[in-house]
Amino acid sequence: MGLPWYRVHTVVLNDPGRLLSVHIMHTALVAGWAGSMALYELAVFDPSDPVLDPMWRQGMFVIPFMTRLGITNSWGGWSITGGTITNPGIWSYEGVAGAHIVFSGLCFLAAIWHWVYWDLEIFCDERTGKPSLDLPKIFGIHLFLSGVACFGFGAFHVTGLYGPGIWVSDPYGLTGKVQPVNPAWGAEGFDPFVPGGIASHHIAAGTLGILAGLFHLSVRPPQRLYKGLRMGNIETVLSSSIAAVFFAAFVVAGTMWYGSATTPIELFGPTRYQWDQGYFQQEIYRRVGAGLAENLSLSEAWSKIPEKLAFYDYIGNNPAKGGLFRAGSMDNGDGIAVGWLGHPVFRDKEGRELFVRRMPTFFETFPVVLVDGDGIVRADVPFRRAESKYSVEQVGVTVEFYGGELNGVSYSDPATVKKYARRAQLGEIFELDRATLKSDGVFRSSPRGWFTFGHASFALLFFFGHIWHGARTLFRDVFAGIDPDLDAQVEFGAFQKIGDPTTRRQAV
């Protein structure tokens, strides 16, 4: 037939059997990729330190999605929350991966069967004897079935009625675990950070889908609407399906980048806005203040800060710090976190506590500036020593650590003080192992960043696909050269282009 590469899908345009076949094969490829990717990630994943080397630091992409749906155990004897387990059951990470691969194989065989046996009676219109699909009826069936699945997920899986529940955590990503969730039917259900909204929205949307599906199965579309929206044309289905997909892709790009109950920070890493707003820093200072109010010493108060909370308050975990085209996991960038050194408190020779101004997200380098409690600059690391007035040496800055590995250690040597001041720009200070993975020291993004970029990019692409195929199906007659206002009798076959007398064929 000699079709160009971008027109090859026209071979299934009027062939319902093979149209079904290629869609089953597509499902086989998607499920096969998911299962294979899960097995690859499990082969390289190190579950030994869920606090300082969680899945998102290791660049895991499909493991977080399995985990948020209730999978936490491995046939390797480990649990995602740490520790060992003896009986993971069939629905472990490997079990889910295997199920996808088996399903992929079955879909592969089904696709081959439908490609060979394409001319089935079910696709034949008994009135004309030609292949045809009752698209409004198929729409009703699909809407009904997806509504049942949606309702079932919300009413059974999420609520724990028949299923594990979903991953639920506190606002600071410290206590996450899989647990049943009760539907939130009040206004709080519309808060994107309330897990109960996931249950209630799936129940509500599923109910609507079931009712809408039954409606479309029992009511035929009016003739004018059927013709106006080209409901008999398979390209209409393609166009509206693309619209549904690109809309969903834009939505999930937003929920991933800005954060929501569906994208817990324990599984996907923190968002950039938590660094921008000093979210974890404020909570750490609140906890320290509460400790001091209980008559704890500064050292004791800082020692009570969970290492997990301190690790979130580090710029290397900000997904916006990694360039889009820097391949590899976060661990391949700044290294594998080994331990928290503690919180550095800087003081000048007059005893004032100084705070290092933190690096904003979109800076690669930033001046080291130390300010007092009133925001007045008291010390810095100058660019030109000759003009300096606030250098560490001149001001006599010292640093003392509270909590962490260096608890109680203090330094007055200017070179050491400056080293820790530079590192304090990046948030809490951690010891990082760059040797094991030959990490290059250049920040990488987390799976949160990759997911957002991928889905926003494909959503834009699919938006244009929707416009393209929508225009093709609505204006098919115009593109074919048939003018709806043509009142002259057209002799088909007389012209190379229908209705265009300038292209009259020559008589042989």
UniProtKB/Swiss-Prot annotation:
InterPro entries: PS_antenna-like (IPR000932), PS_II_antenna-like_sf (IPR036001), PSII_PsbB (IPR017486). SUPFAM superfamilies: Photosystem II antenna protein-like. Binds multiple chlorophylls. PSII binds additional chlorophylls, carotenoids and specific lipids. Pfam families: PSII (PF00421). GO terms for biological process: photosynthetic electron transport in photosystem II. GO terms for cellular component: chloroplast thylakoid membrane; photosystem II. The chain crosses the membrane at residues 21-36, 101-115, 140-156, 203-218, 237-252, 457-472. It is a multi-pass membrane protein. It comes from the Eukaryota. GO terms for molecular function: chlorophyll binding; electron transporter, transferring electrons within the cyclic electron transport pathway of photosynthesis activity. It is found in: Plastid, Chloroplast thylakoid membrane. Keywords: Chlorophyll, Chloroplast, Chromophore, Membrane, Photosynthesis, Photosystem II, Plastid, Thylakoid, Transmembrane, Transmembrane helix. HAMAP family: PSII_PsbB_CP47 (MF_01495). One of the components of the core complex of photosystem II (PSII). It binds chlorophyll and helps catalyze the primary light-induced photochemical processes of PSII. PSII is a light-driven water:plastoquinone oxidoreductase, using light energy to abstract electrons from H(2)O, generating O(2) and a proton gradient subsequently used for ATP formation. PSII is composed of 1 copy each of membrane proteins PsbA, PsbB, PsbC, PsbD, PsbE, PsbF, PsbH, PsbI, PsbJ, PsbK, PsbL, PsbM, PsbT, PsbX, PsbY, PsbZ, Psb30/Ycf12, at least 3 peripheral proteins of the oxygen-evolving complex and a large number of cofactors. It forms dimeric complexes. Belongs to the PsbB/PsbC family. PsbB subfamily. This is Photosystem II CP47 reaction center protein. It comes from Acorus calamus var. americanus.
